From Swiss-Prot:
SUPFAM superfamilies according to UniProt: C-terminal UvrC-binding domain of UvrB, P-loop containing nucleoside triphosphate hydrolases
Annotated ranges, domain Helicase C-terminal: 438-604
Compositional bias ranges of the Low complexity kind: 639-649
Cited SMART domains: DEXDc, HELICc
Name under which the protein is recorded: UvrABC system protein B
Source organism per UniProt: Streptomyces avermitilis (strain ATCC 31267 / DSM 46492 / JCM 5070 / NBRC 14893 / NCIMB 12804 / NRRL 8165 / MA-4680)
A GO biological process held by the record: SOS response
Gene, per the UniProt record: uvrB
């Protein structure tokens, strides 16, 4: 039993809120999943075609089972998309987002061939870190929790029991020494700052203490009368407005890696002991340089730990802080869940192999560091879970995929199928065309689509070909972008949003246009060199790529090939099987396929529960959407000029429209006002807000230039 299973959590029912009811294959799939899980089956596979509503089916399944759930996705982009969907479907429950908090991460490494040591370098996204803390906080305080996570959830996270033991419970009427309370806040890594009140800090004003938990958008006020807690309240950190009066609150540590003084000293002693043993071993092997290197580095780290409680690369000593035996698995997010949690693995054909590969990739780099005296052997225990350890920590699992892998299919007793789309949308028609003249044919097809305000995805085999093709399209005046591995995660999400919004028409990529991308505006997927067998043109890859056109009524897939390979045949046959089943269902029910209408949301903005003062900072440029707790969460919208522009032309091409709904002088004033707001937001460290304001200012400046060129200014 997990230690945290004994913790009392608030119990509230999972409840799906949706204007739609299960339809198509969904009712049967939900009932069968519910039956199998309740019957105790450990592994269940849901083979769900693209666009059949697997996310909604999962939400209804969670509603039936009423169990805390971990949903794993293969990357941050899909995790964000899933979290948005679950937030909409389960607005009254805690839907959390747990991914790596690094915007940039260069791991510590050593290259023996060139004697090059690369120091660890990273940049942490504070908002994502808050969301990680919010996830663990929800898991330890309530049962109605769905956490959407990337593979980051199998990496070490600190001991949940220590995290719980060091939390500070606050209750009205409790007797507590004020100075002792302040010391406890410092012990759990909160910083006193009476001037700048930000997350992870507290301030003291007479008998009033205010603390801003790292996992919240709101702060907590503690009013003392002598040594008694007289009142507790939740307040807005900027305005000071009281949001609620409370009787009982918890303050969790500001770090998942919190350690008390006694634990710190024990860890330091263990590190010293290991250092002595390792130095003896290296000296016996004649590795004097490595021994000296290790002695200098570790002694410096020990001094830092004893003086300030932390050091650079402290995670490499996690085995000693956790009190684990060498080789034992680390604590991870999985250990924060109660025993009966349910695991859902989305796009399992990608995610399952990814989980299995994490350990070896991490270990090979660290072995080199240990062998050359840069780290103690215990650094190898700061690692992700091995596949066997992961399996030991999960109970029942549901695997979701349009193309389940061999592992998933071998585990379950057959699969639950969900092929029919409630919207009546039919799988795209697959057309095989010769490679001769393929680019000219593709240009012709692109022009046909852009005339109808539809989008196109083009997938190539090599980065060079994708770059050359993008350049060629640009020369022809086609609005095109190139999605590649060098584009960071958040920019990748933004590129997909821009494609849907019509800011360009064609997206060219290699292996980034597959699993889970939800793009209803795409009516054509072009697969170049479809007959070149390999990983990118396997049957599974082709079925996934074909699925990108399955959300559009007039969806088509053009495969450019000179022969039909077994992989192509498999993909085409499976697509035709699904088409026939959907056509028969539509005919039986009298359904006319309807286009999928889906809001074009800013995924990155929606995933975070933004500050309540966003509305004041941004004014009317943003509409408001309620989150599950009734607090307002801003959703970016095109206001004023952008709305007019977007309504007239979804393309967003500057030359097509020059809005004239306000004079240039008024527009210039608005630009100046928004610029001032942008600078103020940046000064207050509200960087997400500042970035959105910057984009809006950029659009308005572009409009002003158009007005001047048209002689309207």
């Amino acid at each position: 039993m997990r230690p945290v299973s004994k913790i009392e959590r608030t119990v509230a029912p999972f409840e799906v809120v949706s204007p739609y009811q299960p339809s198509g294959d969904q009712p049967a799939a939900i009932a069968e999943l519910d039956r199998r899980i309740r019957a105790g089956e450990k592994d269940v596979v849901l083979l769900g075609a693209t666009g059949t509503g697997k996310s909604a089916t999962t939400a209804w399944m969670i509603e039936k089972l009423q169990r805390p759930t971990l949903v794993m996705a293969p990357n941050k982009t899909l995790a964000a998309q899933l979290a948005n969907e679950f937030r909409e479907l389960l607005p009254n429950n805690a839907v959390e987002y747990f991914v790596s908090y690094y915007d940039y991460y260069q791991p510590e490494a050593y290259v023996p061939q060139s004697d090059t040591y690369i120091e660890k370098d990273s940049s942490i996204n504070e908002e994502v870190e808050r969301l990680r803390h919010s996830a663990t906080n929800s898991l330890l305080t309530r049962r109605d929790v769905v956490v959407v996570a990337s593979v980051s959830c199998i990496y070490g996270l600190g001991t949940p029991q220590e995290y719980v033991d060091r939390m500070v419970p606050l209750r009205v009427g409790d007797e507590v020494d004020r100075d002792d309370l302040l010391r406890r806040f410092v012990d759990i890594q909160y910083t006193r700052n009476d001037l700048a009140f930000t997350r992870g800090t507290f301030r003291v004003r007479g008998d009033t203490i205010e603390i801003f938990p790292v996992y919240e958008e709101l702060a907590v006020r503690i009013e003392m009368f002598g040594d008694e807690i007289e009142a507790l309240s939740t307040l807005h950190p900027l305005t000071g407005e009281i949001i609620s009066d409370d009787q009982h609150l918890y303050v969790f540590p500001a770090s998942h890696y919190v350690a008390g003084p006694e634990r710190l000293e024990r860890a330091a002693n263990d590190i010293e002991k290991e250092l002595g043993e390792r130095l003896t071993e290296l000296e016996k092997q004649g590795k004097l340089l490595e021994a000296q290197r290790l002695r200098m580095r570790t002694t410096y780290d020990l001094e830092m730990l004893r003086q300030i409680g932390s050091c650079s690369g402290v995670e490499n000593y996690s085995m000693h802080f956790d009190g684990r035996e060498p080789g034992s698995p680390p604590n991870t997010l999985l250990d924060y869940f109660p025993d009966d949690f349910l695991l859902v693995i989305d796009e399992s054909h990608v995610t399952v192999p990814q989980i299995g590969a994490m350990y070896e990739g991490d270990a090979s780099r660290k072995r080199t560091l240990v062998d050359h005296g840069f780290r103690l052997p215990s650094a190898l225990d700061n690692r992700p879970l091995k596949w066997e350890e992961f399996q030991e920590r999960i109970g029942q699992a549901v695997y979701l995929s349009a193309t389940p892998g061999k592992y998933e299919l071998s585990r379950g007793d057959g699969f639950v199928e969900q092929i029919i789309r409630p919207t009546g949308l039919i799988d795209p028609e697959v057309v095989v065309k010769p490679t001769e003249g393929q680019i000219d044919d593709l240009v012709h097809e692109i022009r046909k689509r852009t005339e109808k305000d539809e989008r196109v995805l083009v997938t190539t085999l090599t980065k060079k070909m994708a770059e050359d093709l993008t350049d060629y399209f640009l020369e022809l005046g086609i609005q095109v972008r190139y999605l590649h591995s060098d584009v960071d995660t958040l920019r990748r999400v933004e590129l997909l949003r821009e494609l849907r919004a019509g800011e360009y028409d064609v997206l060219v990529g290699i292996n980034l246009l597959r699993e889970g991308l939800d793009l209803p505006e795409v009516s054509l997927v072009a697969i170049l060199d479809a007959d070149k067998e390999g990983f990118l043109r396997s049957g599974t890859s082709l079925i996934q790529t074909i699925g990108r056109a399955a959300r559009n009524v007039s969806g088509q897939v053009h495969m450019y090939a000179d022969k039909i390979t077994p992989a192509m045949e498999k993909a085409i046959d499976e697509t035709n099987r699904r088409r026939e089943k959907q056509v028969a269902y539509n005919k039986e029910k009298g359904i006319d396929p309807q286009p999928l209408r889906k809001k074009i949301n800013d995924i990155v903005a929606q995933i975070a529960r933004e500050d309540i003062d966003t509305e004041q900072l941004l004014g009317s440029g943003y509409r408001q959407a309620k989150d599950g707790k009734g607090a307002k969460a801003p959703v970016p919208s095109l206001g004023g000029k952008a709305a007019a522009k977007g309504a007239k032309s979804a393309k967003g091409k500057a030359k097509e429209t020059v809005p004239t709904d306000r004079p240039a002088a008024k527009l210039a004033e608005e630009i100046e006002e928004l610029t001032n707001r942008m600078r103020a937001a940046a000064a207050d460290l509200q960087f997400e807000i500042a970035a959105r304001l910057r984009d809006e200012v950029s659009e308005m400046k572009k409009e002003l230039r158009q007005m001047k060129e048209a002689g309207l200014a």
